[in-house]
Design a protein with these regions (language model features):
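Conserved alpha/beta-domain cores
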Residues: 2-218, 222-224, 236-238
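Gly/Pro- and small hydrophobic-enriched strand-loop and loop-to-helix capping segments
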Residues: 226-244
Length: 245
């Protein structure tokens, strides 16, 4: 059985510095005052890899699997800001919110039912602050992708704002194409949806985040208005999977 390779701490630090520089350059090309937030996607990565990123100054991490996040969160410093970026089943919402006090955002809210479950979970957990959520939008139209249709995003955001006081709508999220890159029209679509959601919520569009861009396209996303990019393999190396039994 081949043991998975893990990037050395120095490699992780160098990768983070390179990505930050590329984000800054892309943002400057677009005339933006500041680059988007970098969410280090640490799914399937061992704790030493996360610790190396933390030591290099990274504080925002994204996880895709509830149990993996529940296992990792208590072993990382309390000032880590965790984003859940995978598909979340409604029956796991309570465990996620209760088990990760420093959960900052669930980026994959794609139904009123899930929002309601997160609302109940946040109240039960006695969170001091509202839990941030993003409405996940399927901008590519692929049936394999989760997320609401662009036209349905305003209604879901309105439901959360009106019926889920323990949650706060921070913006929108979309997932890249099958090759982990997004076409420009996906980014343009999400920006357009933000305008519609902002109108429905009666807030300025600039107050709503756009979580878009991954390892293959984060520079393009930054140039097109992303406020948060989710980068994993470019920081930690190729994704690691448990060996088959």
């Amino acid at each position: 059985m081949r043991a998975p390779a893990m990037a050395a701490a120095s490699d992780v630090a160098a990768a983070l510095a390179s990505i930050s520089a590329r984000l800054a350059a892309a943002s400057a090309r677009a005339g933006r005052a500041a680059p988007p937030r970098l969410v280090a996607v640490s799914k399937t990565k061992p704790l030493p890899a996360l610790a190396a990123a933390y030591a290099a100054g990274q504080r925002v991490f994204g996880e895709n699997y509830v149990q993996e996040l529940l296992d990792k969160a208590p072993q990382m410093p309390a000032d880590v800001s965790w984003h859940f970026i995978g598909h979340l089943q409604t029956n796991k919402a309570k465990a996620l919110v209760a088990g990760v006090p420093n959960l900052a955002c669930v980026e994959t809210v794609d139904s009123a039912k899930l929002a309601d479950k997160l609302q109940q979970a946040a109240v039960a957990a006695g969170r001091a602050e509202a839990l941030g959520v993003l409405v996940q939008v399927n901008t590519s139209g692929e049936e394999s992708k989760h997320g609401v249709a662009p036209s349905d995003a305003p209604a879901l955001a309105t439901h959360i704002a009106a019926s889920c006081p323990a949650l706060t709508v921070r913006g929108l999220m979309t997932i890249g194409m099958p090759d982990y890159t997004s076409r420009p029209e996906n980014f343009l679509c999400l920006a357009s949806v933000r305008d519609a959601v902002a109108s429905a919520l009666a807030v300025p569009p600039s107050t709503l985040e756009l979580s878009m861009g991954m390892s293959g396209d984060f520079e393009a996303a930054a140039e097109m208005g992303s406020t948060s990019v989710r980068v994993g393999s470019s920081i930690f190396g190729a994704r690691e999977y448990p060996a088959a039994a």
